[in-house]
A protein has these predicted regions:
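Accessory, non-ATPase domains that flank or precede helicase/AAA+ motor cores in DNA-metabolism machines
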Residues: 1-228
């Protein structure tokens, strides 16, 4: 206890209280309320242990932690048009706040209920926390991250979760397009026009274009969202 100080002490004690309620707790559920750093600190002290217990069945009866929003006519038209079976490219043209995210969420729900995974790509690392929160607030599933801000260990964990099917959702920036997934069901690229999806140094590529190729190879749909489509 002497090793803990200030705000860290309060956060770590609160996390320990939460962990003590169950013998096993999903890492994804912990990260809804606590940072990876807080979890890592108590793990380093030997107070808690992070273990991999292999892919888990998604509890479809309790998949949703919050109910979907009602769709407006334009959103409903888009949902009715999007076929979550087989390859096709869908463009959702809408300004910020027009409801693209709710369409993404409801499409993701569909593929998870089919027993498949979703790859969601965003242009900037800074958008990760708010996007991750939206997914964790809606779904009772594992969400893996893939971006350059992760440590090697975190990147390995996310890679494993996606490749084994433990993570139902993989959220990441352009490099996420290369991450293997056990049973991919849909790819979603938000702000597809953003130049951040293009790697300009070293091995040059367009993550958006590669995602379309991957979707075609996997025979799954891909949704491109943008306020200013390229």
């Amino acid at each position: 206890q002497e090793m803990l100080r200030g705000g860290r002490l309060h956060k770590q004690r609160a996390l320990l209280d939460e962990l003590s309620k169950k013998s096993l707790t999903r890492q994804g559920n912990i990260l809804k309320f606590y940072t990876r750093a807080t979890l890592q600190r108590i793990e380093e002290k030997g107070i808690a242990e992070l273990v991999c217990i292999g892919p888990q069945e998604v509890d479809l009866d309790n998949l949703l932690l919050e109910q979907p929003l009602s769709l407006n006519p334009s959103q409903q038209e888009a949902m009715d048009a999007i076929d979550c079976h087989g390859f096709n490219t869908w463009l959702i043209d809408g300004v910020t706040g027009s409801g693209k995210t709710e369409i993404y969420l409801q499409c993701i729900e569909k593929v998870i209920r089919y027993g498949r995974q979703a790859l969601v790509m965003i242009p900037e690392i800074s958008l990760t926390p708010q996007t991750e929160k939206r997914f964790r607030d809606r779904f009772n599933v594992e969400v893996a991250m893939m971006h350059s801000g992760l440590t090697d260990q975190e990147r390995l964990e996310s890679w494993t979760e996606a490749a084994t099917g433990q993570a139902a959702i993989l959220l990441g920036t352009r490099s996420a397009v290369f991450t293997p997934m056990k049973n991919p069901g849909i790819i979603i690229i938000d702000e597809e026009h953003d130049q951040s999806y293009k790697q300009q140094d070293g091995f040059r590529y367009s993550a958006r274009d590669l995602a379309v190729i991957r979707a075609k190879q996997e025979k799954i749909p891909i949704i491109l969202g943008s306020a200013t489509p390229s």
